[in-house]
Amino acid sequence: MIVSGLSGSGKSVALKTFEDLDYYCSDNLPVELLPDFVKSRLRGNPVGDQRLAVGIDVRSRSDLTQLAQWRQAAQEYGIEARLLFFEASDEALIKRYADTRRRHPLSHLGLALPEAITRERQLTEPLRTQADAVIDTSTLNVHQLRRRVVTEFALGSHDRLSLLFESFAYKRGVPAEADFVFDARVLPNPHWDPELRPLTGRDAGVREYLDNEADVQRYSAQIVDLLDTWLPRLRNDTRSYVTIAFGCTGGKHRSVYMAERMARHAREQGWPEVATFHREQD
């Protein structure tokens, strides 16, 4: 997966999302080093067993037009190299730079921010024209962008069903995209334990606390039975992924724990494409 686009458009968020899903990631890689990088990662490993995500943009100061030639050569060796291009409106980019107070990568040319953005659009146009997908992040927040990367690009092949286990806080609404929704507020709440309060459902202390609760074991067993029975029936559906969402009061302890637990179970059952997304945490 090749991640490119305008500075401030969300490329770093996308790469971090791929990394969280066990892609081997490298950012700001010069195009001319891409062939050697891929060869080094594939050496001794079948092509299908490797997931790579590479960030390429104007910071590398390399000839971006070389990428098309490399992608064609990679395809001949059975390597699928998809190119995602992230962009946003000038207004959105200027606001993001104002909020973060970071310098634009082309500011060393003595350009004001609007001019630097315009120049970067010109330099990255060769990448945009050959992109497999152009993602406009002008109206997306970080959580929405991460979710879109997970569901549309990171979960792999669209000819097989992928599973996304999501956690959320009811006080911020139920995810509109959820196919299954389970209420974890019926479970004991680690929030009331002062030592567990600052932790999340991914931490060992919270896991041990909930693992030792009989109601949690019963709740989990019943959900496992339901999902194991009905998820395989959806393989013949036209959808490419299914979202199973767990909600609790704050989206921090119980819902995160359940999403992670069910994702582990799905992987143990042999589902090839499984991801987690914690809306209030990621």
From Swiss-Prot:
Keywords, alphabetical: ATP-binding, GTP-binding, Nucleotide-binding
GO MF annotations in UniProt: ATP binding; GTP binding
Binding site for ATP: 5-12
Superkingdom, natural source: Bacteria
Residues annotated to bind GTP: 57-60
Purpose of the protein: Displays ATPase and GTPase activities.
PANTHER family: RNASE ADAPTER PROTEIN RAPZ
Family statement drawn from the similarity comment of this UniProt entry: Belongs to the RapZ-like family.
Protein known as: Nucleotide-binding protein XAC2976
Classification of source organism: Bacteria, Pseudomonadati, Pseudomonadota, Gammaproteobacteria, Lysobacterales
